[in-house]
């Protein structure tokens, strides 16, 4: 299926409680005496935990807003397979998915996830390699929305596109290359669509562009070459919703 890194950190009690609400397995909880109120819940759940001093947290997680409460989880448990995503969307007459090609910046990844949640996207598909993993930065930037979304990690985006096309999805690729004659994104009128967006610097590769059913762009001031990828995703998704 898919493998991300084996561990990731959650910072703060809010993220911990969200993880419990979503029935995620927590490997260990590191906390200080200031979180005594949660110690009873931790013991009741039978979770492994360690008590640490404030100094320990500041040494281990320098420059991070750790709140003296850090959980260790396996992020792989948040992932679904492409088959599970198809099961979710097959019964829907309309559906929007987002597919990411090698997004490198975890802040961009997290911001995209947050936007996808707000825009009621049914699933986000991303690569196993050359892609920012789901880590503490992504979780924090997503404002915890990562826990509530259908996330699919694949080794081959082209295969995922072909599979989803067989289930009624049309692939809409973003590009800045005017030679490809991209249309205004507002002209898209597919009931089931995949928004395919590329790497922050290189965009989409030739194969993905070839496999796309339609190429689109965001009309903008000609003095501007491009937008931040997370901003572009937001503009298109909410443009489609309206």
From Swiss-Prot:
The keyword Transferase appears for this protein: yes
GO biological process: methylation; RNA processing
Any one GO MF annotation of this record: RNA methyltransferase activity
EC number: 2.1.1.-
CC terms in the record's Gene Ontology section: cytosol
Pfam families, alphabetized: SpoU_methylase (PF00588), SpoU_sub_bind (PF08032)
InterPro entries assigned: Alpha/beta_knot_MTases, Ribosomal_eL30-like_sf, rRNA_MeTrfase_TrmH, SpoU_MeTrfase, SpoU_subst-bd, tRNA_m1G_MTases_N
PANTHER family: 23S RRNA (GUANOSINE-2'-O-)-METHYLTRANSFERASE RLMB
Protein name from the UniProt record: Uncharacterized tRNA/rRNA methyltransferase MG252 homolog
Organism: Mycoplasma pneumoniae (strain ATCC 29342 / M129 / Subtype 1)
Lineage: Bacteria, Bacillati, Mycoplasmatota, Mycoplasmoidales, Mycoplasmoidaceae
């Amino acid at each position: 299926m898919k493998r991300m890194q084996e561990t990731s950190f959650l910072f703060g009690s809010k993220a911990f409680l969200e993880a419990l609400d979503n029935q995620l397995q927590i490997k260990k909880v590191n906390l200080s005496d200031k979180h005594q109120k949660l110690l009873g819940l931790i013991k009741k759940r039978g979770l492994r935990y360690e008590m640490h001093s404030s100094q320990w947290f500041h040494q281990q997680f320098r420059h991070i807003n750790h709140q003296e409460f850090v959980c260790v989880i396996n992020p792989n448990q948040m992932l679904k397979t492409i088959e599970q995503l198809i099961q979710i969307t097959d019964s829907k007459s309309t559906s929007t998915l987002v597919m990411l090609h090698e997004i490198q910046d975890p802040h961009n990844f997290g911001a995209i996830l947050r936007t996808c949640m707000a825009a009621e996207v049914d699933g986000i598909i991303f690569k196993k390699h050359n892609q920012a993993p789901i880590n503490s930065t992504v979780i924090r930037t997503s404002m915890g929305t990562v826990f509530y979304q259908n996330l699919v990690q694949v080794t081959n985006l082209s295969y995922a596109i072909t599979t989803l096309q067989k289930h009624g999805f049309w692939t809409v690729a973003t590009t800045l290359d005017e030679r490809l004659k991209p249309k205004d994104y507002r002209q898209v009128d597919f009931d089931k669509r995949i928004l395919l967006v590329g790497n922050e610097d290189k965009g989409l590769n030739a194969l993905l562009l070839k496999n796309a059913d339609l190429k689109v762009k965001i009309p903008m001031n000609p003095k501007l070459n491009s937008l931040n990828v997370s901003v572009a995703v937001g503009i298109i998704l909410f443009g489609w919703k309206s």
